[in-house]
Amino acid sequence: MDLTRQEEAILNGEQGAGRQKAMELVTALGKIYGADSLIDITSAHLSGASYKTIGDGGLKYLEDLVAGGAQVSVPSTLNPVGMDRTRWKEMHIHPEFAEKQLRIIDLYGQMGIKKTCSCTPYVGPNVPSMGDHVAWAESSALSFVNSYIGARTNREGGPGALAAAILGKTANYGLHLDDNRKPTVVIDPEIDGSVFSYSLLGQAVGMAIGSGIPYFKNISPEVEEAKALSAAMAASGSMALWHAEGITPEAGNFDISDLEVIHIGKKELENAYDKLNRTEDVQLIAIGCPHLTEKEMHQIAEFLKDKEKKNKDIEVWFCTSAEIRERCAEDVKIMERFGPVLADTCMVVAPIEGTFQRTATNSAKAGNYLPTLCSQKAMCRDITALMELVL
């Protein structure tokens, strides 16, 4: 890799141990993936924030970075953590877990990272522009900004995104390059246009192709639908970029005439649904993976406003960002008749396996991760169908 004189100085430790560690990691990744240089980034979004996922080893790594004077160089936001910072007792969290989780959040804050604790920073404080090079680590969020906004990021891991945030640079390879953003397959779907249908579509596409860059025809996703589609494809497959004809900003740049066309219809959507549903009996309904938007909060509250919770045996959690929870105070009052509106967290990175064994969700992403990361039997349905379980 060709490094500038300043980058060489960082690698040699002339700007402190924290920046040196970051440069060692970014250049190592660049060499692995064949990058010829580093590029400046405008923002970062960091995963690896839950004590459940990073453990004591991750906590020690963050402590070492802070001790080495590490500070982020670009606006940086943080992914959900393992609990609501103030309402963790309502989530059945052990005090020792809570103590270490709060320590992790504090360490990120000491490095200058905004303690947003949300997987949807693009509807809040971290909104890239088309063509911006960024380093984002949350799979659903990076797919959204790559695709719907036209920013450029690879599928960063947590340590890599943090290192890039500290440097304000990342290695120039993969989806930062024009040639690697071309679609590889055309998807011709038949869906009803609901948010849940986009989640099932993403699941079906992941099951059909696994990886690649799909180009969608005949869909018109708004933010909520694009969020669901991005999350599902990143979890059921490994897709970090998609295009939609007439919708996403780069879709008009490509000739798709020679690409394979895959039809996703009723049969494929039913197969996706069956894959995500492994129980008819649940103990927890967890809604908000990725985090609920302001529009979704309004819709849920509108549906629930004249209803009451009758099934007291099933807990209900709604997950969103602290900013949106505060902004939707009237909606929260209605929703909290059914269960807590939690911020900072989600069911996937919380230690729910200590309390629950069967969890329902509206998200194909969560439907994939609940069995593997949380030892749950999962149910996946749209929000209305889920809430009818307790009405």
Give the residues covered by each predicted segment.
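Non-transmembrane, aqueous-exposed alpha-helical and coiled segments at domain scale
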Residues: 1-391
